[in-house]
Amino acid sequence: MIKEGFLIKTPKKLIALLGPSGSGKSALSIELAQELDAEIFSLDSLSIYKDINIASAKPSLKERKNIKHYALDHLNIDEKNNAPLFKTLLEDAMRVSSKEILLIVGGSSFYLKSILEGLSRMPKLSGEEVVKIEREIATLSNPYIFLKSIDPNMAFKIHPNDTYRTHKALEIFYATCTPPSEYFKANPKKPFEHAISLFALSIEKSALHNNIKRRTKNMLHSGLVEEIKALYTQYPKDSQPFKAIGVKESVLFLEKRLTLKELEEAITSNTMKLAKRQNTFNKTQFNNLYVGSAEEVRHAILKHSKSGIKG
């Protein structure tokens, strides 16, 4: 829309649709995007990778042709995804989208929480520096104990089993020679400048289990093992996507450490455990989160999006 020679940016209404794996987020998001003339931003730590289509349950080419999706097929297998990258991609999507509504859809709620709360500016490192730091951390017999020795305040905020956050804290220490808590004090978080309305799907446990079992069978019938085999022979074995559910079990099968039946059972079981963690995270980590069945959430999003309130 042009006014007096200036390009007036379309005001964006950001709506997040969260939920555990197998809860029906993708199907509902396609339905909502069609009804609301919206576009979709994929908040998924696996769909962001090229060539991982079956394991990530990526939207079909037909769905993507009808509705614009952002943050799909952005990374190569040997590249890393993280919250700052998703924030950059979300801001890019907001900038280029011509639609009034952008649906943020996915199961990687941890990244959304990080974006909402704000991200501290991280030290800029060259590829060589990253490799050197990774080697330093790899030599530690107990990274958490080491973090505790250099920065008790930071260690107190991190659970001993939270290897991801421990690793991130140690990266900052080795990159800056500064205790992470001091670094964050000097580089405070900047909360996200745009309001995001939050909705999450809740699904009865037995129905979710059936969905996940069916989804696993479909993935295997669609060629999951063949997809992973092609990638595992091409890329470094420690690449981030190879740790994901559906991928790591397929690798064990390819290494003849699981039978086909055990592979199916392992993917189903691990996806159920993930779904439980995702549910708990969504319900405990977000304020003002509307939780309901698919029909309840659909109705609430339609009502909200047609209201005059932005954000």
Swiss-Prot record:
Highest taxon of the source? Bacteria
Offer one Pfam family short name for this entry. Answer: IPPT
Task: Quickly give the catalysed reaction.
Answer: adenosine(37) in tRNA + dimethylallyl diphosphate = N(6)-dimethylallyladenosine(37) in tRNA + diphosphate
GO BP annotations listed: tRNA modification
Q: Which E.C. number(s) belong to this protein?
A: 2.5.1.75
Q: Which residues bind ATP?
A: 19-26
Question: Which positions are annotated as binding substrate?
Answer: 21-26
Cofactor(s) demanded: Mg(2+)
Keywords, comma-separated and alphabetical: ATP-binding, Magnesium, Nucleotide-binding, Transferase, tRNA processing
Site entry (Interaction with substrate tRNA), positions: 108
Molecular function in Gene Ontology: ATP binding; tRNA dimethylallyltransferase activity
**Has UniProt tagged this entry with the keyword tRNA processing?**
yes
Tell me the segments the record calls region Interaction with substrate tRNA.
Answer: 44-47
How does this protein assemble? Monomer.
What family does this chain come from, according to its entry? Belongs to the IPP transferase family.
Chain's role: Catalyzes the transfer of a dimethylallyl group onto the adenine at position 37 in tRNAs that read codons beginning with uridine, leading to the formation of N6-(dimethylallyl)adenosine (i(6)A).
Q: Could you tell me what this protein is called?
A: tRNA dimethylallyltransferase
Native organism is: Helicobacter pylori (strain ATCC 700392 / 26695) (Campylobacter pylori)
